[in-house]
Amino acid sequence: MTTNHSLDIPEGFILHELSPQSEQFLTMLGPWYYKNVPTDNGHVERVFGIRIEPKHTNIWGTAHGGMLISMADSALGYNLSRSTEPPQKLVTVHLSSDFMASPKPNDWVETEFRISKIGKRMSFAECSLKVGNKIMLRTSGVFTVLNQLKKVQND
């Protein structure tokens, strides 16, 4: 049985084509959608979205927390890496998440991203996952620049 993922996707969102070679984990969790939204500071935020399916749920029938954290981590890393020119390769150093509510099957979940600080070696940001205007998950993340990480490991 195939699922038509184009049904019930909010206007403006398009399917996020993932590389099966390099993004197998996210491919397994998808399908992911996105839209690019201009910000006040002249950057573009990529808002990610997903329709919760039964495969995304835990034993209680709500969205699995690990899947939600993966979504927040991906949105944080993607948007932070592209907030500088040129874009930087970043890896997660720390995530802290608060579960506020539980998305259910057929809920549409979107990311909302905010930069806290961008430094030479570390960057900090926050991401909320929302169903409509209701916050489901609040995550703060710390990321390091990949070439800086290699430099520290080699010292």
Where are these regions (language model features)?
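Terminal targeting signals and extreme-terminal segments of soluble enzymes
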Residues: 1-155
